[in-house]
């Protein structure tokens, strides 16, 4: 197996600490069936540390140190993920960085440093679809004394009067409701229980009824959750000419 040894240059997620790198590379290379191809790092994840000339140069220096100490080629240097694209496009990425692990920028078309649209990409590539299973006009504020909800939160409510509220067959066991943005700007995600999503449909651009499908754009976290939920069916749309 060809492997990359991950080293931590500041984000404090995965990766050995720099002063352990040589020992780990040497030990890994001694294992049967293992071919250490190079080193890599991860940024803009747990700690939100942005890729920079400084931490990328540090990664190159660590590779050079491990190469000199072990005699291994270590020709691959994986500088990070989608968050590295702005640095790369600026021309400031050290030339030794020859690999990036791109996910969100390709799938969702977003700059992961600020979630702005990435140039020449689309942001409508993934939809989360739920079906309306109940549709009722109800008050927008609960009746009676309130405390914590089912998830230990104290929720505040805005009085919008009587509203058309849909219950959809999607819940927190599948995705956090804050990670869903309605495709229809007239829809408002109000919240969710474990298996039900509550959406205000009063200002829907189209008429709705029980059985109507409601569509949402997911954030990266929403895509991660729904893509790994066994209760969410996945389907790939047929490519079409733009």
Residue ranges and their predicted role:
Residues 139-242:
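C-terminal accessory subdomain/extension
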């Amino acid at each position: 197996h060809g492997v990359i040894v991950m080293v931590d240059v500041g984000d404090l997620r995965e990766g050995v600490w720099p002063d352990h790198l040589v020992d780990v590379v040497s030990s890994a290379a001694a294992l049967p069936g293992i071919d250490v191809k190079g080193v890599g790092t991860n940024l803009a994840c747990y700690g939100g540390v942005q890729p920079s000339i400084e931490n990328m140069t540090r990664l190159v220096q660590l590779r050079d140190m491990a190469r000199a100490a072990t005699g291994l080629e270590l020709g691959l240097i994986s500088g990070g993920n989608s968050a590295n694209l702005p640095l790369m496009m600026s021309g400031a990425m050290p030339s030794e960085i020859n690999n990036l692990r791109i996910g969100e920028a390709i799938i969702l078309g977003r700059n992961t440093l600020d979630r702005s649209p990435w140039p020449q990409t689309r942001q409508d590539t993934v939809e989360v679809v739920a079906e309306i299973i109940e549709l009722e006009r109800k008050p927008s504020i609960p009746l009676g004394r309130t405390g914590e909800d089912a998830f230990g939160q104290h929720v505040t409510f805005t009085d919008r009067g009587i509203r058309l509220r849909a219950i959809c067959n999607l819940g927190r066991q599948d995705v956090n409701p804050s990670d869903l943005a309605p495709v229809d700007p007239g829809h408002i995600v109000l919240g969710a229980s474990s298996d039900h999503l509550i959406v205000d449909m009063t200002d829907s651009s189209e008429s709705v009824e029980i059985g109507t499908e409601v569509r949402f754009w997911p954030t990266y976290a929403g895509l991660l959750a729904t893509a790994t939920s066994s209760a969410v069916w996945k389907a790939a749309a047929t490519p079409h000419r733009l």
